[in-house]
Amino acid sequence: MALSSDYFVRGISRTNNNPALQLDLHYTNPNGFVAGAFASNTRIDPGEPRDVELSAFLGYAWNFDDAWHGRVLASHYAYPWNRAGSHYNYDELDLDISYQGWLHFSAGYSPHSPRFVAAPYRELIGVSEQSAEVSAQRQVFGKLSLLAGVGYSHLDGPKSGAYTYWSGGAAYDLQSVTLALGYVNTSSEAKALFYNAAASGQWTGTVIWRF
């Protein structure tokens, strides 16, 4: 469970720069099967009331050797109570390769990621999105870890485009609770694709409780 001052996905706010309460449940078995569910409040369109994002995922994890690990996930995201109906819903396929658990290389694809287009639609439409990201979380002193990441996302459809996003911060573990502080930013191209939802040098604070 987590409480965050904002909910960012690839540098884009899904809560209109408002706090988010989130719940994540996951299951793994020795054969590599992975499954789980995630829930968060959202407000993708500032003109809409607050909504809830519900997602479920299935996947498989494996080891290349003692240091390198892989995982592939297929996820479905649903926003059941928004006025746009199923226009928000989308699916995503993600591949993650990690080194010793602290360095991650990931790639994702969605055939119908939601994006608002002013003309000629003036509504959310589903467009294909391809993304790639490198991220790291490294323990540096005691229970203190440093975090950093950089990624690239390309969206097709009308007025297609691409942008980069990056973040940095620190996390401190207190047994079952983690406190995190981060900085999120995006390139100027993100504003043309997502308007005010794109991060522009924002700080975020998060409290994570594991049970």
Give the positions of each predicted feature:
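Residues that define the transmembrane beta-barrel architecture of outer-membrane proteins
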Residues: 17-21, 50-54, 68, 87-93, ...
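Detector for outer-membrane/organellar transmembrane beta-barrel domains
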Residues: 84-155, 183
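Repeated loop/turn-to-beta-strand initiation elements of outer-membrane beta-barrel proteins
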Residues: 31-37, 66-72, 101-107, 138, ...
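Outer-membrane beta-barrel architecture
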Residues: 24-26, 57-59, 73, 94-96, ...
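Outer-membrane beta-barrel translocator domains and adjoining extracellular loop/strand segments
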Residues: 9-16, 46-52, 82-89, 115-123, ...
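Outer-membrane beta-barrel "beta-signal"
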Residues: 138, 168-177, 183, 197-211
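Transmembrane beta-strands of outer-membrane beta-barrel pores
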Residues: 3-9, 29, 39-43, 62, ...
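Glycine- and aromatic-enriched membrane insertion/assembly motifs of diderm outer-membrane
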Residues: 16-69, 209-211
